[in-house]
Design a protein with these regions (language model features):
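Anion-recognition interface
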Residues: 1-296
């Protein structure tokens, strides 16, 4: 049975869901039952590749590309090594979406805040990050929730994937220059179809997903994101983990309302960029052989 051969491995809060919805329109691309299988970087991997294929891809037909859009793979050495093992005898391609690292970190922080899992302001959360990641070293989900700055160190993570799979197998997208401008967005979608060597189809790009939001009802958000009796009942009612994931996502969507996002203070943003990201971005620009213009 076939499974994924086209991976979007990052980055969270860089419009990966929007791109996923767009690519799902293409006749030569298979849509999985769940956008983020979260297979190669957590305990689901122990279920085996047959489980992965049967759970998410049992309805694959003759599409050229089969999607796995799990943007947390980029930060996982487990995922890197496991995908490398999985790749034997397969033609895999990768999509990576990058965004101004400070803006991505702040959007990530707002997402965790919305989920009711953050009680610090952004500055204090940054200061607490190293200690938090150490405390949660055996808890992948908590690490992903609180690694605001770490997940914006793109060169640190992407360079490893390039070493394993080769630069020519990656299509890298700059959110700030290729998604925010509609004409550049259309051109990027055209170039991506060429990269995948599929026919050029007219795809609707007027899609906005995972916009900055707040919870309508905080108690519902807390229930969705916490463990307890309700989670155990859900396991009894819904034997399939996939169905539980779909239900939780639907509840989250129903409980969201758009928020007015406050911009980061320009001086604070520049200080964060210079302190945490300047050196990494210079190495990233050298790796990609292009200027990213995030600090112009």
């Amino acid at each position: 049975m076939r499974a994924a051969n086209l991976f979007c491995i990052g980055c969270p809060k860089s419009a990966t869901t929007t791109l996923f919805k767009i690519l799902c329109q293409h006749s030569q691309i298979h849509t999985p039952k769940f956008k983020e299988p979260f297979f190669f970087n957590n305990s689901n991997y122990q279920n085996g590749l047959d489980w992965y294929a049967n759970t998410y891809y049992d309805d694959v037909k003759n599409e050229k590309w089969v999607l796995d859009f799990t943007p947390s793979y980029l930060y996982s050495d487990d995922a890197l090594f496991r995908i490398n093992e999985y790749s034997k005898g397969k033609d895999l391609k990768f999509i990576v979406m990058l965004r101004n690292p400070v803006e991505r970190a702040y959007s990530h922080y707002l997402h965790t805040l919305r989920d009711g899992l953050e009680d610090l302001n952004f500055n204090d959360a940054i200061k607490a990050e190293s200690e938090r990641l150490l405390n949660y070293k055996n808890n992948l989900l908590s690490q992903l929730k609180y690694s605001y700055m770490y997940q914006s160190l793109y060169h640190k993570h992407l360079s490893k994937y390039f070493e394993f799979f080769g630069r020519n197998n990656f299509f890298v997208i700059n959110y700030d220059s290729q998604l925010l401008d509609k004409s550049e967005f259309k051109l990027m979608i055209h170039d991506l179809q060429n990269f995948l060597e599929i026919k050029i189809e007219s795809l609707n790009i007027e899609i906005e997903e995972n916009f900055a939001s707040v919870s309508r009802f905080k108690i519902l958000q807390t229930l969705v994101n916490s463990n307890g009796l309700h989670k155990r009942l859900a396991k009894l009612l819904f034997k399939s983990k996939l169905n539980r994931q779909i239900l939780i996502n639907k509840l989250r969507k129903l409980n969201e309302k758009k928020m007015v996002k406050k911009d980061i203070d320009a001086e604070f943003k520049k200080n964060l960029y210079d302190k945490y990201f300047h050196a990494d971005v210079l190495k990233l620009e050298s790796l990609l052989e292009k200027k990213l213009h995030w600090n112009d």
